[in-house]
C-alpha cells in the first residue's frame, strides 16, 4: 500500500555480492575467510550479508570449499557462546523458507550442504535454518539472486564480460579484482549502491558513507539561498 506513497521510502532485500575477477580467480582460496564472514556475520540476516558469489569460471571447487566451511556452523542454543545463528520467532517460518528454496532448485542448481546438516534444525527450544550454499551455472536461475533470513548464498558462474549487466540490484558489492575495465564497469553500474574494491567484507560499513543516503536527504529538500544584507 506504500509503494506509490512519496512520503514513504521503501527498502527491500540487499542481494549483496562478492565478485571475483578473472585476474584473481586462481587465488580464490585466499578469500575464503572473507566469503564466510560476509555470509554468516550477524546470523546472515542483514541486507549487507553476501547472498551470492559471482565468478567468471567453473566454480564447483569454490562451492565445495565454501560449503565445507559453512557446514561447520550449525544451530546451537542461544546461550551457547559458540552460537552464530538466530532462531526464528515463528517456528513455522524455517520450514516454509526451506520448502521455498527446495521448490526453486530444479536441475540447474545443487545444494552443496545436503547430506551434512539438515537445513531446518532444533536447538535449545528454538527453530533455526543451518547455512545453505547453492551452486548454479546460470545467472537466470531463481536462486542466483535469492536472499533469505539466514546464511544463504549461491555461487554463480557467468562470463566476466557480461557479469556487471547480469548481477541485478546489489546493495553492496565487494569486487576482488585489479582489472581496471571491470572496476570501471562496476563504478558506472546503476545496480550497485555500495562498492568495496579489494578484500573488504560486505558487512563492513563506513558510517560516514551511507549507501542509501542520509535520512535528511529524504525528509528535506536542499536549496541554495542568498539574501542581501541590510
Annotate each predicted stretch with a short phrase.
Residues 36-37, 68-72, 121-230:
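Conserved C-terminal structural/oligomerization subdomain of aldehyde/semialdehyde dehydrogenase
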